[in-house]
Amino acid sequence: MSDLEQLQSQILADIASASDEAALEAVRVATLGKKGSISALLSTLGKMSPDERKSEGAKINLAKDTVTQALAARREVLKALALDARLASETIDVTLPLRESPAEAGRIHPLSQVWDEVTTIFADMGFAVAEGPDIETDDYNFTRLNFPEGHPAREMHDTFYFNPKEAAGSEAGEKPSRLLLRTHTSPVQVRTMLSQKPPIRVICPGRTYRSDSDQTHTPMFHQVEGLVIDKSSHLGHLKWILHEFCKAFFEVDNVNMRFRPSFFPFTEPSLEVDIQCRRDKNEIRFGEGEDWLEILGCGMVHPNVLKLCGLDPEVYQGFAWGMGIDRIAMLKYGIADLRQLFEGDVRWLNHYGFRPLEVPTLAGGLSS
């Protein structure tokens, strides 16, 4: 074996034994660097005769190419080994239980919890979830819901209006309709009736806005409304749905409900619903007692609303209801002040919040 072949074999052995990229770089410098062994051989070619230079130069360059390829291959192997070691050191066991410290484990906000509970209950009854924009037109928020011009709810002190110059047409060719922050989620019902053919069975949860702020009111709050439209729906169906919802939501075997006549522009007849309860100091117990507590409003969809949404009231009828998610959250979980829901106090959230990954189910208990 020639000296060049021995040198090449030794270099390849050093490359194969390099345990990391730093060691491999040291081999490269010792071999191909300015003062490396192969570089030194290349520097001797100038002293040779033309024939020797041609013969020896080809051998040395072949050895250089072989070493260069071996260095590149070993470098890729070492990179893969380094990545595997890094991944192994950073592995997280996702099967480990959550830490108990409130500072290390977050909590689900009561509003998020109740939102999930409500949608779970109505989904079990076959309702879909419909959503719409927070910024609405006067047409969808009021006119198509049978609010006449001059109705108190249209006044500035109740509704957040945008600049009068910012307006949009509800339908092509119609005159512009003023923009506002929706005061209820009922516009979603309007959009649903305009875009879908009956039968319709949806709930409409979302944020709503009114110019009001005290212990039981905030400028932004959450509502969930429901809508059923078909050819044979009646108040008996509405009563059953609300009764089943209250039993499931408050997690009681039975609940007494009281339906009182009321007035809403978009329903006729209109009703307000009270639920029987017992007040025990700072706690409210449902399904027992002699007290009554208002929880929602409802009624049969007004024929004018059906007409304004493109449905024939001689063929279709339906019912709707609405309740405040914030309010029923306060009632169920004993929250005294509505404003606390929006203050972002971590101590309050640690007390009233829920553990993550506990998804509400009817079979497993909504809030267990």
Curated annotation (Swiss-Prot):
Give the catalytic activity: tRNA(Phe) + L-phenylalanine + ATP = L-phenylalanyl-tRNA(Phe) + AMP + diphosphate + H(+)
* One Gene Ontology biological process: phenylalanyl-tRNA aminoacylation
The subcellular location is: Cytoplasm
Gene3D superfamilies (UniProt xref):
Bira Bifunctional Protein, Domain 2 (3.30.930.10)
The EC number(s) given in the record are: 6.1.1.20
InterPro entries in the record, alphabetically? aa-tRNA-synth_II (IPR006195), aa-tRNA-synth_II/BPL/LPL (IPR045864), Phe-tRNA-synth_IIc_asu (IPR004529), Phe-tRNA_ligase_II_N (IPR004188), Phe_tRNA_ligase_alpha1_bac (IPR022911), Phenylalanyl-tRNA_Synthase (IPR002319), tRNA-bd_arm (IPR010978)
HAMAP family, alphabetically? Phe_tRNA_synth_alpha1 (MF_00281)
The record's subunit annotation is: Tetramer of two alpha and two beta subunits.
What's this protein's name? Phenylalanine--tRNA ligase alpha subunit
Q: Which organism is it from?
A: Nitrobacter hamburgensis (strain DSM 10229 / NCIMB 13809 / X14)
Q: What is the lineage of its organism?
A: Bacteria, Pseudomonadati, Pseudomonadota, Alphaproteobacteria, Hyphomicrobiales
